[in-house]
Regions:
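Short sequence motifs at beta-strands and strand-loop junctions characteristic
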Residues: 8-9, 67, 95-98, 144-148, ...
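Extracytoplasmic
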Residues: 12, 22-24, 39, 50-52, ...
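Short strand-turn segments of transmembrane beta-barrel domains in outer membranes
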Residues: 54-56, 62-64, 74, 79-109, ...
Length: 214
């Protein structure tokens, strides 16, 4: 299994399993199909690693119970649980390109008997490009897009006396991606459409919004 960039301009990545493209690999969120359609190329970056407890990978044709996409295999993401003993987790990360990332999770019981519990997950990251637009190969295009990502998820769990469980929750994500030639700005988008014959700068601006609930 390998991960590679399928589009250098937008920063889209895909998983290759058994030599086939990522569209043949099914990604599950606790056995629920996610990352279909336009969100598939960015699916991995939409699930912060600090939100996860484990990742389960199975290769080969799987059951169609959760969908028909699992031709080469399945990747199942297991998140932190509302019943976790760790009540508060905060993680701050800063890489050598001065890209900050903040993750927070808090799990707590809502009732004294702990039958009802919840967990709140927050994530924020920002490509600052404070050291300049990365262009290591000198082709005039940014090697990485300028990305601003914010995500919040809230999960609930109710456990009855007989052991039956009811789960529900939601996740909202907002992301802006700006890429293309160095020094390209979002305000130049109209110039790229109308003045392309005059050497206007080329760039790409992508806005993704995602809301799902279960």
């Amino acid at each position: 299994m390998t991960v590679g960039y399928s589009d250098a301009i937008s920063g889209a990545r895909q998983i290759k399993m058994l030599g086939l493209a990522g569209t043949y690999t099914q990604i599950l969120d606790e056995n629920r199909p996610i990352m279909r359609g336009l969100s598939a190329p960015y699916g991995l970056s939409y699930t912060p690693g600090m939100w996860l407890n484990s990742i389960q990978v199975s290769k080969g044709i799987s059951s169609v119970t959760a969908g028909h996409e699992a031709i080469t295999g399945q990747i199942n993401l297991e998140h932190r649980k509302p019943t976790d003993d760790e009540r508060l987790f905060i993680n701050f990360y800063l890489d050598d390109e001065l890209r900050p990332e903040l993750n927070l999770s808090t799990a707590l019981p809502v009732t004294k008997d702990k039958k009802l519990s919840t967990i709140l997950l927050l994530h924020g990251s920002l490509d600052t490009h404070l050291l300049g637009d990365m262009d290591d190969n000198g082709d005039g295009f940014m090697d990485l897009p300028k990305t601003r990502l914010g995500a919040v998820a809230n999960r609930w769990l109710y456990t009855a006396d007989n052991g039956a469980q009811v789960r529900w929750g939601f996740k909202y994500l907002a992301e802006n991606r700006l890429s293309g030639q160095k020094h390209y700005k979002a305000s130049m988008r109209e110039e790229m459409d109308t003045d392309w014959d005059k050497g206007a700068m080329y760039g790409s601006q992508i806005k993704n919004r995602e809301l799902n609930a279960y």
